Curated annotation (Swiss-Prot):
Leading EC class: isomerase
Subunit structure: Forms a cylinder of 14 subunits composed of two heptameric rings stacked back-to-back. Interacts with the co-chaperonin GroES.
Taxon lineage: Bacteria, Pseudomonadati, Pseudomonadota, Alphaproteobacteria, Hyphomicrobiales
Keyword ATP-binding: yes
InterPro entries linked to this entry: Chaperonin_Cpn60_CS, Cpn60/GroEL, Cpn60/GroEL/TCP-1, GroEL-like_apical_dom_sf, GROEL-like_equatorial_sf, TCP-1-like_intermed_sf
Catalytic reaction equation(s): ATP + H2O + a folded polypeptide = ADP + phosphate + an unfolded polypeptide
Compartment(s) of residence: Cytoplasm
Record protein name field: Chaperonin GroEL 1
EC number from the UniProt entry: 5.6.1.7
HAMAP family according to UniProt: CH60
GO CC annotation, single: GroEL-GroES complex
UniProt gene name: groEL1
Source species, domain of life: Bacteria
Amino acid sequence: MAAKEVKFSTDARDRVLRGVDTLANAVKVTLGPKGRNVVIEKSFGAPRITKDGVTVAKEIELEDKFENMGAQMVREVASKTSDLAGDGTTTATVLAQAIVKEGAKSVAAGMNPMDLKRGIDLAVEAIVNDLKAHAKKVTTNEEIAQIATISANGDIEIGRFLADAMQKVGNDGVITVEEAKSLDTELEVVEGMQFDRGYASPYFVTNAEKMRVEFEDPYILIHEKKLSTLQSMLPLLEAVVQSGKPLLVVAEDVEGEALATLVVNRLRGGLKVAAVKAPGFGDRRKAMLEDIAILTGGQAISEDLGIKLENVTLKMLGRAKKVVIDKENTTIVNGAGSKKDIEARVTQIKMQIEETTSDYDREKLQERLAKLAGGVAVIRVGGATEVEVKERKDRVDDAMHATRAAVEEGILPGGGVALLRGLKALDAIKTVNADQKAGVDIVRRAIQVPARQIVQNAGEDGSLVVGKLLENSSYNWGFNAASGEYQDLAKAGVIDPAKVVRTALQDAASVAALLITTEALIAEKPKKSEPAPAAPPMDF
């Protein structure tokens, strides 16, 4: 086992603080509408230019192991905030730095670190309650566009695209962001449920020009097992023929005699039919077939449930307004399932998303949720160069998460003002002793820092502007750093999602309080590398 180096008390906290400062100072220049860019060297390809706090934080690795510990702890704040809220990473980093700095001073003055932590926790709880009380629900498309624009650093085009995407696929719909091959940014929306399985045979095609199957108002048979013979299905097929409606068969596989019989019937014109394989594999396939059944108001025919194919009636089949099948995908539009059943299924999937620990499972569950809840939107981000496209794609990702967060918990005035207004909530806190009161005061000073930093990045005097803001008691009144004016920020469209502000504060306080209460640091001793032996003389 390698030898370890140990640092204690003041020495330990000083090293941590240096690391925190190095990382936070690099990140905080990006804060606000007039924040600057950070250029990151890449081991291959062009350098990356970004204004995304978490991207900058993830690139920082310090040589001194003890300083690096401090930097990594604050990097954790940015990552956690990014995971939970998708934005607010720079605000969280700035808050963490402020709390650690103020806390280190208090500990150096001889205060009890544990009481300071309790005071910090009380203050954070009071501000979070204040933020929740003042959060305003998002209702209009314009508000969504404003939030997306701000989170994309003032890019109005991105804001408009995101608002359109959310309007079309709903709040639970999946929005994916890709790099475009052209200069223009474009939006493509797939309505209804789409899964990646095409027709089992090209003979099913009804639109020869586009090589796809198009059915209006079809019946949908959802079968869990393979279909290799149609003997047991004949009564059902006769009933479908009499109804005059088309039939879509979704099964694990349709092969041999069954496929041949369906193709022959299709070509003779007696039966409008198409067959596709069921999406997914294993347990996920069962779940997706159940999703299709709920969406279309049908029943998944499964031997587990004791339903045999010969007993299936038309009432057990799903219905949809339209089905489109091409070589690779099947899209079911306007399924006839009851809204209540679909909502119950959506709630069930949401609970599974919360409980799962696997990122892969979470992603697949979110895809299923989106397919049930309304559709999938793809935003293709364009730009003149690869560097520009990557930078814009980062901003679209941020904006998308911020917009979702706003719809979830509502909005607050931006520009760091919501945190400033939380100062009043701190006055009502009752503390047990002077050290806890000092903990509350640490947060009192820290929550002024984001607003000050935004103003400084815009080239104004931070302390002067914050002083002016505190003189005015109107909740939404603040400094618009983009225009350099004092105004009602909510009316001006300078808004932040409540979830982003709340998460940034809670994550920052959580990690900063741990750093304040740190008394020892342990790291591996750097290995002394032996000098390389001298090369032999050339005439050897």
